[in-house]
């Protein structure tokens, strides 16, 4: 049907007869000659229809609508010198048509323009409702082709490293310790339910027990959670697991994987190895375990300097076991007014969204003089002021913003304010050259965090992470006592403030796995019910193993420069977890529900 793709034609094809297929991007009549921009996935080529080639051919071209599907036959020839279009890869040539067949006309009204020449923004809701049309747009086609290149590159790298791709079940059982599951009722096993996998975590560990040694999968995962711009109810992970490798070997292999992807897709040589921060270092310096290191304004813990200060907001927070931290805004005196920091201001609101009651501030003037509210200025002695300015590095013209209270709240508030000001003040460079891809491994996470509402420990990552050997010791009788304070052999890869993926070494000792499950409050009987198949496997010669998973939707979002992963997925859901094109989810018939022995108790409020 076609001999060439539209976008592949070049000067070397001059004098060749070609057959092309594609969509009419636009059609225009210039002085009795019709020019058709014919578009397919590969690009666009100019078709020239001359009346000298035949009246019927010319008449057919005159009646074409945009997005009509065509087959064109013709001769490749050079464009006149004054008609060369340097913006197109095919801009030095055109095809003189000698045949035109409409393969499918457009009979309905187009909801929006697809043409590469029309950059008019289209509302996302309209794009998602007519996604089949939206996918023809150059931007979306380019994004999906880049996604393909990214995944293809990852597959080739892993296969060259001895990994094999194995598919794991999509219908599995529901397990605790995660987001909500998507549940699927079983018709055959009445009253019982499958769950769609949130990750292939347990199956990939079982593959290691099964002796496969190196596994990967481009896995579909499902989580019933509240959505953001970078979240979807169904998403794609590059899932990797390997036996007989320590943490250092795993990190180095995956650095090479990421570097290979960036080289293939962006043509960039990433500097290796990636920097590393421990979890505690990241929290102390940035207030988050996924810091954006492209700009400064790091957090400073000034609790030791201000613990005896007469300003009770500060000294009281420290006495209660909390902390006082600050960030220094360069030239903040000129850039930020008091109104923005006080209640109702945008900076105040950012801190409040993170749970803080507000922010205190100091303005540094000439000769190291300071301005602030009286309660701070009057209670800050000369020694404290000198120590504060020295530790923060603040100089004349700078603004110091303080958070005081529970350390977790202070970290969260100042992290949010730091990110907000980084964007507002233009501290984050916009051109993405090699220096601005700031990769970072965060390592040595705590094994557990406290769930204050339920007054119990929860696994910070998941309950299958192996604890640090030095923290745990070799005496199984002491493990229960040591586990709550242990670090996990876990690691996350962060890029420019976004988590790309994470993983850990896994527990391969059955008794240790039981004790970890008990530490998070799972009774032994329930642990055996939920995870008995895993514990049984660990008792049958499980090798040391570990791995990680990368969020491919997010990686592609960053590589394309998009703001939302919805623009890197062919058929995404909205933030209400709906597909506007197919109108999913939708109701089902009573007969279907009866077969499943399921009854809906939902009542339409209208």
Curated annotation (Swiss-Prot):
A molecular function (GO) term: nucleic acid binding
Region (Aspartate): 201-204
A cellular component term, taken from the record's GO annotations: cytoplasm
Keyword terms, alphabetized: Aminoacyl-tRNA synthetase, ATP-binding, Cytoplasm, Ligase, Nucleotide-binding, Protein biosynthesis
Recorded catalytic activity of this chain's protein: tRNA(Asx) + L-aspartate + ATP = L-aspartyl-tRNA(Asx) + AMP + diphosphate
SUPFAM superfamilies reported in the protein's UniProt record: Class II aaRS and biotin synthetases, GAD domain-like, Nucleic acid-binding proteins
PROSITE patterns linked: AA_TRNA_LIGASE_II (PS50862)
EC number(s) stated in the UniProt entry for this protein: 6.1.1.23
Assembly description: Homodimer.
Protein name: Aspartate--tRNA(Asp/Asn) ligase
Source organism of the structure: Prochlorococcus marinus (strain MIT 9303)
